[in-house]
Design a protein with these regions (language model features):
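N-terminal basic, amphipathic alpha-helical segments
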Residues: 1-134, 332, 339-342, 351, ...
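Short beta-strand "wing" residues that participate in macromolecule-binding interfaces
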Residues: 61-63, 170, 424
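Conserved core segment of the aminotransferase class I/II
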Residues: 129, 305-371
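Conserved core of the PLP fold type I
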Residues: 140-277, 289-290, 295-298, 302-303, ...
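Conserved glycine-rich beta-strand-loop-beta hairpin in the small C-terminal domain of fold type I
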Residues: 368-378, 389-403
């Protein structure tokens, strides 16, 4: 099944033997990557690659922040010898991108500042929020037992005021409070599309968005997006003339993973173009408040005159993800009546913080810190990466997109880097066909410490070494 001449193939085979006829039973947790490295005297890259193979074959699954487990359905009721076990290829295999993401999620608890799209938790106003939450719970015990929050709650009014700052003429009753997760995408995809239809997205795109589209049985039309200037409007216009598109899902301001920003003229043109074709737009504006400049950039929604733009954002991402509060502005509010909302105590805590006069100063400090971090990463990459590595100046967000020459394999680079406990996100996570595997994304939401600088320098040396091998490969072939 696997090439046992490779170290990772042999390791995958040995683990398969243990799953099929050895000590590992359905539901059992596999030893940690560190333990497997010690046991088999193998690098973390070799062990991780072997686990990729087993997961692709449907034999194991990963649970975020927990580890790898033997899949229940892989086994028959009785133990069978290896020869009688159904071939793993008969099991539904996960796409390569998803398997890779699941494997990387095992590192969630590890200190990997460049891997996950996270912001330094020290930048969040935890003390102020804790104080407000304690006061709210003491003076309003009904929040602890649950009370119904109507469309004219303090949080609705605060968000309506912020909408006017963003150039959006919405009112408290237009706003739906949501959990800060992908439930908004799920609800809007269910409402606006049918399985088998096509949704246009910017490419590169967040892996979670690609997963949602896949789970809804939707086809993906990838529109190229420049890491600095955003969506290619000419390509979108061409695609709309040739393809039947049920909906679009775009971000105008600092989208993950590139961090570009569209001009206001470009945003207006996109909204007008979609209105001409009657195509709804799902706008994810969760990063719009993370701008480095003085003025908050306008979202697509600010140019919407037809109601075709379905807007959502995540406020808790600005103050701490533990609150898990987002909101949507859409004419499909009735579709959200069946989904869960954040606890009332959390909602009133956030609205009190926003009304206290502390919110805007906090946002300024947060933006200044992220802008400083971004500059630190830019300087470190310029200093340590080879000149062939092209990074892009962004004006918001907390990630850096880096392009390497076509043909460069950043997934192979990741496996090499994991041997030194260095991790990043390879480009193939952010597209459907692996065409971005010459790119990578670094999280810049954490400061560049001495350790991070050392890791960037080591990663730059690995890139230079891999580029040298790429250049020598044609000459080797010519001599052969």
């Amino acid at each position: 099944m696997w090439d046992r001449s490779t170290r990772y193939g042999e390791l995958a085979f040995q683990l398969q033997e243990e799953i099929c006829s050895g000590p590992l039973s359905p539901g059992d947790k596999l030893p940690s990557i560190r333990a497997l490295c010690a046991r088999f005297q193998a690098s973390s890259a070799t062990v991780t690659h072997a686990l990729y193979l087993l997961e692709d074959a449907g034999m194991i699954s990963v649970r975020p922040r927990s580890g790898f487990y033997v899949r229940e359905r892989f086994h028959a009721v009785e133990r069978r010898p290896p020869a009688r076990v159904p071939e793993p290829c008969l099991q539904p295999a996960l796409p390569a991108q998803r398997a890779l993401l699941r494997s990387l999620e095992v590192l969630a608890a590890a200190d990997q500042p460049m891997l996950f799209a996270r912001i330094n938790p020290e930048l969040y106003p935890a003390v102020a929020l804790q104080r407000i939450m304690t006061e709210q719970a003491r003076h309003n015990p009904a929040f602890l037992t649950g009370c119904l929050i109507g469309p004219d709650s303090p949080l609705h009014r605060q968000l309506a005021r912020r909408g006017r700052i963003m150039g959006c003429d919405w009112h408290a009753e237009d706003i739906t409070i949501t959990l800060a997760n992908y439930e908004v995408y799920r609800t809007l995809f269910r409402s606006l599309t049918q399985p088998g239809q096509t949704v246009a997205i910017a490419s590169p795109a967040p892996m979670r968005l690609l997963e949602e589209l896949d789970e809804h049985g939707l086809k993906v039309l990838e529109i190229p997006s420049h890491p600095e200037h955003g969506l290619s409007i000419d390509t979108l216009e061409f695609a709309l003339r040739r393809e039947k598109v049920a909906a679009c899902a775009f971000s105008a301001n600092f989208p993950h993973p590139t961090g570009g920003q569209m001009s206001d003229a470009g945003k207006r043109r996109v909204v007008e173009l979609l209105a001409e074709h009657g195509v709804p737009l799902i706008e994810d504006d969760r990063n719009g408040d993370l701008h480095f400049g003085e003025k908050r950039p306008l979202p697509f929604k600010a140019f919407d005159r037809t109601g075709l733009v379905h807007y959502f954002s995540d406020v808790s991402g600005l103050v701490g993800h533990g609150l898990s509060i987002g909101f949507a502005v859409t004419n499909l509010r009735h579709e959200f009546e069946r989904i869960a909302q954040p606890p009332e105590l959390f909602q009133y805590t956030l609205s009190s913080f926003m009304a206290s006069g502390l919110f805007e100063p906090h946002l300024r400090r947060l933006r200044q810190a992220l802008a400083s971090y971004s500059s630190q990463y830019q300087a470190a990459v310029r200093a340590h990466f080879p000149r062939e590595a092209r990074s892009f100046a962004v004006s918001g967000g907390h990630w850096m997109w880096i392009e390497l020459p076509r043909g460069f394999d950043t997934t192979a680079l990741l496996r090499r880097a994991l041997q030194d406990d260095i991790a990043f996100s390879p480009g193939q996570l952010f597209c459907t066909d692996g065409s971005l595997n010459h790119c990578l994304r670094l999280n810049t939401g954490m400061p560049v410490t001495e350790t991070v600088e050392r890791d960037i320098a080591a990663l730059g040396a690995m890139i230079a070494e891999q580029l040298t091998l790429m250049r020598s490969a044609p000459r080797e072939a010519d001599r052969a």
